[in-house]
């Protein structure tokens, strides 16, 4: 990484495939639409200080491989990884197994409260 330029950060945001349609027809929308909004907030914030490499929320094995290929092609300096909610571990395990060596910053956001009333 050149210290005079912005870092190139790969964003690995993991979601739960089984929840994608959950919440359909509710005022807050589906799980997927809510997680897309959350992802957008993280991308905007990171975009203030880094060049972001992102190819969407990772839900399944094919998403993991596509994301790894993109991160490798773009030569990311590091990866920011985060579960957007509970999700199966297989995507994370495949990422750790198959991603070439790169610094990984794992984040776990703890919310003060959950506003879930209707899913």
Model regions: which residues?
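Metallocofactor- and cofactor-centric catalytic cores in central/energy metabolism, strongly enriched
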Residues: 2-119
């Amino acid at each position: 990484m050149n210290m005079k330029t912005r870092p190139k950060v790969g964003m690995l945001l993991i979601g739960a495939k089984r929840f994608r349609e959950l919440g359909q027809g509710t005022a807050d929308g589906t799980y997927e639409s809510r997680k897309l909004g959350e992802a957008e907030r993280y991308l905007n914030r990171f975009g203030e200080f880094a060049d972001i490499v992102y190819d969407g929320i990772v839900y399944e094995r094919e998403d993991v491989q596509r994301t790894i290929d993109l991160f490798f092609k773009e030569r990311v300096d590091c990866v920011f990884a985060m579960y957007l909610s509970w999700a199966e571990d297989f995507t994370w395990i495949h990422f750790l197994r198959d991603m070439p060596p790169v610094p990984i910053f794992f984040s776990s956001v703890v919310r003060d409260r959950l506003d879930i009333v209707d899913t």
